[in-house]
Regions:
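Non-heme Fe(II)/2-oxoglutarate
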Residues: 226, 231-329, 339
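Short, conserved beta-strand element in jelly-roll/cupin
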Residues: 109-131, 218-219, 226, 257
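Amphipathic alpha-helical scaffolding segments comprising HEAT/armadillo-like alpha-solenoid repeats
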Residues: 318-332, 350-364, 382-394, 413-427, ...
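Structural detector for internal amphipathic alpha-helices that build alpha-solenoid repeat scaffolds
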Residues: 298-319, 337-352, 369-384, 391, ...
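Non-heme Fe(II)-dependent double-stranded beta-helix
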Residues: 1-114
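Double-stranded beta-helix
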Residues: 132-233
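Extracellular structured ligand-interaction cores
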Residues: 117-123, 133-135, 211-216, 250-252
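Short edge-strand/loop segments of extracellular domains
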Residues: 90, 139-147, 256-262
Length: 459
């Protein structure tokens, strides 16, 4: 059965983007899972709308000691649950979803995604989940990569999808299994249907390192999965006989969790060095097979989360800065990891004026992929990036204003001038996309301020 190592929870999360808690790690009486499952079966059979008012026992899972311990580590103490939309159970059936990242709301707001663990999704399975029961399908290690989310108008949530034509062409509405499927049981069991093939090819075409589909199975009854809000995933069809579906339904509850506090982060010249040269026992992927770009990303996020450090002050000579600049400006969606990795690599050497200047140049670049990578790199620099983000908010380009606004929320100095700037953008910017980011940026700034010595003054 699948489960994570509690002693390496942060390590697993910043690399894989997902951790799994066994029923023992969750820490409630196993009988509770059976009670929830039986109640849910009855409500489902009676076609009731299922929520916590129908099954109040689900709240005991949210209060479980193992869940609290894991969430405290990943998104900080006093984390909260989004009290509306999508906190609901799902039943697995005959259809496949396309690969997607859940919407970053409000719908089509085209907001940048937080690379730091601010949003978390929690999945709870009251029953065991075997490989034929429609296990949730994920793409581990995909949480830091995406596509142009500014000018792509082909879908409802920016471009956080793989092969959105799968949806547009109607394949998501075609049953893969069950009595209305046109596939044979052999095709379904061997995962050789047109749906299976196309969904696998969508992953392969990214050409991103370590990227392979991973079905979250087998799971014991009462397992909890915590994964990054940025992880590509999809709902999956059942592969067993249709007669089993009603007898043994597969339920999954989903909750959106978010960070409400954030400890002050410092620059550190001697951060905790953690090794990524190992086999991921969950996915069986060899992490040492990756390039330096992934390690730069993982190093940053491990130290941010586990050691409260913003950057790793590594000395960068001119040759290294030049190499990273070339990677930051490289073309092609397949090179997304190189651009993002280069940005974090430059951030780690931002004590070098040359490295910082490359990130500033990238922020003002016309290409969205470079600008986005540079934004994350400058966020990795910390408060030192305040002035360049302030400058970006005055641009004639709404997309650059959006990047600057996002950056101020993430790392802008907790100073009145930053609050005033974000407030002005919220009230006066001509772009709804920028105003949306400004509203969230004020919340991000408040999240940082409440944990600092300046909290009373700033609030």
């Amino acid at each position: 059965m699948l489960q994570s190592n509690f002693d390496k929870l942060t390590h697993e999360f910043v690399t894989r983007g997902m951790v799994i808690l066994s029923p023992e790690q969750v820490g409630v009486d196993k009988q509770l899972h059976q009670e929830i499952y039986e109640k849910e079966k009855g409500a489902f059979s009676n076609k009731q709308l299922i929520d916590a008012t129908v099954i109040p026992e689900i709240l005991e899972i949210l209060k479980a000691p193992g869940v609290i311990k894991a969430c405290n580590e990943l998104i900080g103490e006093d984390w909260a649950i989004v009290p509306f939309t999508h906190n609901t159970p799902f039943v697995s059936g005959s259809h496949d979803q396309h690969w997607h990242k859940d919407d970053n709301g409000p719908f089509n707001g085209r907001r940048p995604r937080y690379h730091h663990p601010v949003q978390l999704e929690m999945l709870y399975y009251p029953q065991a989940v075997g490989p034929l029961m429609g296990p949730t399908s994920t793409i581990p290690y995909s949480q830091y990569w995406t596509f142009n989310h500014e000018e792509n108008h082909d879908n409802f949530a920016g471009a956080d999808h793989l092969d959105f034509q799968y949806q547009i062409n109607g394949m998501e509405r075609v049953p893969v299994s069950g009595p209305k499927s046109n596939y044979s049981q052999d095709q379904i069991l061997s995962q050789s249907t047109d749906h299976d093939v196309r969904l696998r090819e969508a992953v392969e075409k990214t050409q991103w390192p370590l990227i392979e589909p991973f079905e979250v199975t087998p799971l014991e009854a009462g397992s909890v999965v915590l994964y990054s809000h940025n992880l590509f995933h999809r709902g999956n069809h059942r592969r067993d006989e249709f007669s089993n579906w009603k007898i043994n339904p597969r339920f999954m509850w989903r909750f959106w969790l978010y960070r409400t506090t954030q400890k002050p982060k410092t620059r550190s010249r001697n951060p905790h060095k953690t090794s990524f040269d190992e086999l991921d026992k969950l996915t069986r992927q060899q992490l040492s097979d990756t390039g330096s770009e992934l390690e730069a990303v993982w190093d940053h996020h491990y130290n941010w989360l586990a050691q409260d450090c913003y950057v790793i002050d590594e000395p960068l000579d001119k040759k290294k800065v030049s190499e990273l600049e070339n990677k930051l400006f490289v073309l092609g969606d397949e090179n997304e990891p190189q651009r993002i990795g280069a940005a974090y690599g430059l951030a780690s050497g931002a004590s070098s004026t040359a490295a910082l200047n490359v990130l500033k140049k990238g922020l003002f670049e016309e290409r969205e992929s470079v600008r986005r990578a540079a934004t994350y790199g400058l966020i990795g620099v910390g408060h030192k990036a305040t002035d360049v983000f302030m400058k970006a908010t005055a641009s004639s380009s709404k997309w650059l204003r959006k990047a600057g606004t996002f950056g101020l929320g993430e790392v802008g100095e907790p100073h009145a001038k930053v609050v005033e700037k974000l407030s002005d953008v919220l009230h006066e910017d001509t772009s709804v996309y920028v105003r949306s980011v400004a509203a969230c940026a004020l919340g991000s700034l408040a999240r940082r301020v409440v944990s600092s010595e300046k909290s009373k003054e700033m609030l």
